[in-house]
């Protein structure tokens, strides 16, 4: 059984994430972000999930050192604050984009995102009644006030949404496919396809890791 270690950045959504992973058939172990990097690695995770949480990613305990230790070696999935940490680790600028909390918005898939297996069949602006139309809009739950407007080197944007800062990245992956991040909350009821997205993210990351020969 796939073992996911979830780093808890002290957010109220953490156990919703745990429930979603367990319901999808994954084993999940939770560590607070106050433990050591060594503690996380000693659990022998198949994948590490960096949870949502308050504040800036640089202030979130071990998160940044953990990313430095495992990037490209252990599959990483960042959610909200965890995604911002991945962006920051690649020298992306994480900055205020206007607070939006508890709102479902349609993010717009990029050209790469349209082709990405995580979002296949989830768009709301395409379907059998619209032949030939390429869908790009996927409804997701926003609970954040920080964002990144420009995708940093080493990462590829999969989706964006409009904010006070302009378009910010809502989903991205590293160019080696070993890390992926979602700015939105897939575990929220306001992300209708969220549980499916989570499962697909895990499966995609593990597949990529097997191709890279890290597992």
Where in this protein do the model-derived segments appear?
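Cysteine-nucleophile active-site neighborhood
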Residues: 45-122, 198
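Histidine-centered divalent metal-coordination motifs
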Residues: 80, 144, 185
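Catalytic beta-strand/loop cores that center a nucleophilic Ser/Cys/Thr
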Residues: 115-176
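Conserved hydrophobic/aromatic beta-strand scaffold that supports enzyme active sites
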Residues: 104-106, 169-171, 181
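Phosphate-binding/catalytic loops
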Residues: 118-122, 176-177, 181-192
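Flexible gly/pro-rich beta->alpha loop and the following alpha-helix that scaffold active-site loops
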Residues: 3-7, 11-78, 90, 206
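Proline-centered loop/turn at the N-terminus of a beta-strand
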Residues: 75-77, 93, 139, 156, ...
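Acyltransferase
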Residues: 189-215
């Amino acid at each position: 059984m796939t073992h996911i270690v979830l780093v808890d950045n002290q957010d109220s959504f953490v156990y919703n994430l745990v429930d979603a992973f367990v319901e999808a058939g994954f084993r999940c172990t939770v560590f607070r972000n106050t433990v050591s990097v060594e503690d996380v690695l000693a659990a022998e995770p198949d994948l590490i999930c960096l949870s949502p949480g308050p504040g800036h990613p640089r202030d979130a305990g071990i998160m940044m050192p953990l990313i430095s230790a495992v990037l490209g070696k252990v599959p990483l999935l960042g959610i909200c604050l965890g995604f911002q940490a991945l962006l920051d680790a690649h020298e992306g600028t994480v900055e205020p984009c206007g607070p939006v909390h508890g709102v479902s918005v349609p993010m717009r898939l990029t050209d790469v995102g349209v082709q990405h297996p995580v979002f296949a069949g989830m768009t709301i602006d395409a379907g059998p009644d619209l032949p030939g139309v390429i869908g790009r809009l996927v409804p997701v739950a926003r609970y954040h006030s920080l964002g990144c407007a420009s995708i940093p080197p080493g990462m590829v944007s999969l989706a964006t949404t409009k904010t006070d800062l302009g378009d910010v990245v809502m989903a991205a992956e590293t160019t080696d496919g070993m890390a992926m991040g979602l700015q939105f909350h897939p575990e929220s009821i306001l992300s209708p396809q969220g549980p499916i997205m989570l499962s697909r993210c895990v499966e995609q990351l593990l597949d990529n890791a097997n191709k890279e020969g890290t597992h």
